[in-house]
Amino acid sequence: MTEDNEVQIAGMSIVIVCSVVDPASQNIKEHLLKLRDWVEMSVPGGIFDDLSAVYQSGNFYIIEVTEHHIYQDGIDRKIEEAGLDCDLLIFASKHKSADGRRLLTAHFTGNPGSADFGGYPGELSMAAPFALRCLLRNMAELSESIGFDVSMESTHHGPSDLDVPSVYAEIGSSEVEWVDQDAGDIVARSILSVRSGFCPVGIGFGGGHYAARQSELVLGSDISFGHNFPNYQLQFVDVDMFRKAVERSGADLVYCDRKAMSSDEKKRINELADEFGLDVLRESDIKGMEGVCWDIFRIFWHKVRDEGLSGRVKVPVGLKDKLSENVCDIFDFDVSNVVTVVIDNELLKLVRSVDAGGVKRLLDMSNVVYSERDDATISNHFYTFWNRDAEDFLTFIVDECIKILKGRYDTEYVFEENVLYISDERFSPELARKWGVPSGPMFGELAKGQSVMIEGNTVLPEMVHERTQKSLVLRNVIF
């Protein structure tokens, strides 16, 4: 994410563009005028061809035009020429669809393919991901009681020739909703609540126009999205369009709606992401990094992959405060600072055989980052930035694993030798046969500790069990 895409809080000027010919835009404008004290102002003539009015209230401006918003290419330059400050453009508009959904939306503009509704072919506007995040979250919070859905839309229509960060805020999807007073009030309040800030920014690929999974991530995780390309636009995403999306979004990562995309398309997008040095994160990865500084999460992400491991990077809740944005502001971490703890894999396998979820529960109480494979098993590599935490974790995990094993086996850990001795009583089919027990149900009864009768003789469980012992050298290491 770059400062070209998101502006600093101090001195941020927001220009709201409203259209006379758009009923939803007029609805939003009327509520904006009610919510703050505005002063109508004049600007030099000859700059705007379709100017209706200009209002100012603090750091907010309303510019009302007589034409549709989608044809306002270059309006950022006109605003500058008129002597107005503009760090962010918000287009207050209607959303139209045949299904007539009660819907509040936000999206960016541009034309990955042809320019059928304003803008230019193959051109993307400068996106404002944090503003989109603010809008959608404000809309969702304020609209809970009025029956409107909230969604991010994929990139579409004009204007595309905009170098100031911009975003659309819309009411949909029919004449009834466009003039709905509650909807107008909510969108107006959402616009006035927009602030600047920084968060990880993804560019999205796949799925439908309304980007359901991407919308969910904006509303429920720590990231936002820049430009988004649904399935019907993927054909236009070549190297040049991918580069534009990265640059015009300030992208940190790539997200694919994997279930909605073909294998070939996923492979192609992954290759483009590699070419531009961007990570492709899954939904679970994005949700898992909640509360963790993006730069720190990315360090662990790459550490896991540099060691040839796969799966999701998991950060226990108790560790997140130590890896938050505040820590990023204080320390300058990189991958060379990562301390790796390797726990003996046989120990973890043995614990898993006794208690399938035991290791996971221990890790959720721990102070290290770990990797969970796609089959939900845990890698034996664990990570932290602090040597003391690594040493404490090694002691903790070994002690707790032994406690779990003691619930099933007789165990003895010899610290000086770093050896774990494990003893077990096991049913022996061979001994059972020697006592005349045939294979079948009686084997099961004896294995469960129950006696059986053979030709009038009682065969006790202890007669057909044998004691085994094995030693496990714990190959644990910190480096």
Curated annotation (Swiss-Prot):
Cofactor: Zn(2+)
EC number: 3.1.1.96
Stored InterPro entries: Deacylase_DtdA_archaea, DtdA
Enzymatic reactions: a D-aminoacyl-tRNA + H2O = a tRNA + a D-alpha-amino acid + H(+); glycyl-tRNA(Ala) + H2O = tRNA(Ala) + glycine + H(+)
Keywords: Hydrolase, Metal-binding, Zinc
GO molecular function: D-aminoacyl-tRNA deacylase activity; zinc ion binding
Enzyme class, broadest EC rank: hydrolase
Textual note on the cofactor: Binds 2 Zn(2+) ions per subunit.
SUPFAM superfamilies on file: AF0625-like (SSF142535)
Gene Ontology terms: biological process: D-amino acid catabolic process
Coiled-coil region(s): none
Taxonomy, superkingdom: Archaea
Family, as annotated: Belongs to the DtdA deacylase family.
Purpose: D-aminoacyl-tRNA deacylase with broad substrate specificity. By recycling D-aminoacyl-tRNA to D-amino acids and free tRNA molecules, this enzyme counteracts the toxicity associated with the formation of D-aminoacyl-tRNA entities in vivo.
Subunit structure: Monomer.
Name by which UniProt lists this protein: D-aminoacyl-tRNA deacylase
UniProt source species: Methanococcoides burtonii (strain DSM 6242 / NBRC 107633 / OCM 468 / ACE-M)
Lineage: Archaea, Methanobacteriati, Methanobacteriota, Stenosarchaea group, Methanomicrobia
